[in-house]
Amino acid sequence: MVKRQFDYEQKVQEIREKLEELNNLSSNMEFDLSQEIESLEEKIENNRERRYKNLSPWEKVLLSRHPERPNSNDYIRYFCEEWIELHGDRHFGDDSSVIGGIGRFNGQAVTILGYRKGKDTRENLQYNFGMPHPEGYRKIQRLLLQAEKFQRPVITLIDTPGAYPGIGAEERGQAWAISQVLMTLSALEVPVIAVVSGEGGSGGALALAVADRLLMLSNAVFSVASPEACASILWKELERVEDMARAMKITANDLQRLGIVDEIIEEPLGGAHLNFPEMAEKLKKALQKHLGEILSQDSGELLEERFQKLRKIGEFRG
């Protein structure tokens, strides 16, 4: 049976509740079990630390999909002193699974683009589970060109299972829309920093990942397709999804070793959702550092370095 949810924290919470009951019981019956309870709590924390430092790639996939994981909305609200969301692709409509606009980050006007997942059923339906349509990618391209025109740096936040694979999306040119974003980002004459904050799936994620710097949260994943899709296609066995997650090299550590990711932002113990302020502050400081480093570069130097960075990806080293 393939595990579909990372439920370790739930089990820890259940044990803590039992300990709390035991503590109350000992108080009522005048037994002093405080030392034993304290010792057990210390063991729980030590076990948690070991557990989270040794997560398998598949467990990181599950953690990256956690329904309470911070989304692009959360980070934008934390980062920006001012924020104006912009809508529409000026061709077909407005895709709510893509959030984009102008913000003031650390006193600097920036364009921020990201994918938007929901935290409950209503929001997931509204945002199409974070899967953009072609109009979403056209909105991204429009705002990228606007950022270049007004010389605003671009920050992208990536958390999507992939582009929406529906018939309507294909009829409206899904692949073409993604390719236009890739082409635009490759030649954009302003600094671009991309952050894989959760699930980075397929071409949908790749569309916002062409950047001067690529940052990744420690429990995020980034891959050409989901492990489930690869297991179904290559092995015809969904049960081998954990083997596929391992083989695909989709974790932040794997991708940094391969030279794709520039920096890993360590998440709080248990995941970004358990301590959002700490996670957001770490990411904010990393963005400030990288933005400060590349803002001083002229556009020609920036484009050349971006080109060389992209050319090295997938290069065979014998």
From Swiss-Prot:
<keyword id="KW-0808">Transferase</keyword>
<feature type="domain" description="CoA carboxyltransferase C-terminal">
    <location>
        <begin position="32"/>
        <end position="293"/>
    </location>
</feature>
<keyword id="KW-0067">ATP-binding</keyword>
<dbReference type="GO" id="GO:2001295">
    <property type="term" value="P:malonyl-CoA biosynthetic process"/>
</dbReference>
<protein>
    <recommendedName>
        <fullName>Acetyl-coenzyme A carboxylase carboxyl transferase subunit alpha</fullName>
        <ecNumber>2.1.3.15</ecNumber>
    </recommendedName>
</protein>
<dbReference type="GO" id="GO:0016743">
    <property type="term" value="F:carboxyl- or carbamoyltransferase activity"/>
</dbReference>
<dbReference type="GO" id="GO:0005524">
    <property type="term" value="F:ATP binding"/>
</dbReference>
<comment type="subunit">
    <text>Acetyl-CoA carboxylase is a heterohexamer composed of biotin carboxyl carrier protein (AccB), biotin carboxylase (AccC) and two subunits each of ACCase subunit alpha (AccA) and ACCase subunit beta (AccD).</text>
</comment>
<comment type="pathway">
    <text>Lipid metabolism; malonyl-CoA biosynthesis; malonyl-CoA from acetyl-CoA: step 1/1.</text>
</comment>
<comment type="function">
    <text>Component of the acetyl coenzyme A carboxylase (ACC) complex. First, biotin carboxylase catalyzes the carboxylation of biotin on its carrier protein (BCCP) and then the CO(2) group is transferred by the carboxyltransferase to acetyl-CoA to form malonyl-CoA.</text>
</comment>
<dbReference type="GO" id="GO:0003989">
    <property type="term" value="F:acetyl-CoA carboxylase activity"/>
</dbReference>
<keyword id="KW-0444">Lipid biosynthesis</keyword>
<comment type="similarity">
    <text>Belongs to the AccA family.</text>
</comment>
<keyword id="KW-0443">Lipid metabolism</keyword>
<dbReference type="Pfam" id="PF03255">
    <property type="entry name" value="ACCA"/>
</dbReference>
<keyword id="KW-0275">Fatty acid biosynthesis</keyword>
<keyword id="KW-0276">Fatty acid metabolism</keyword>
<dbReference type="InterPro" id="IPR029045">
    <property type="entry name" value="ClpP/crotonase-like_dom_sf"/>
</dbReference>
<keyword id="KW-0963">Cytoplasm</keyword>
<dbReference type="InterPro" id="IPR011763">
    <property type="entry name" value="COA_CT_C"/>
</dbReference>
<dbReference type="InterPro" id="IPR001095">
    <property type="entry name" value="Acetyl_CoA_COase_a_su"/>
</dbReference>
<dbReference type="GO" id="GO:0006633">
    <property type="term" value="P:fatty acid biosynthetic process"/>
</dbReference>
<keyword id="KW-0547">Nucleotide-binding</keyword>
<dbReference type="GO" id="GO:0009317">
    <property type="term" value="C:acetyl-CoA carboxylase complex"/>
</dbReference>
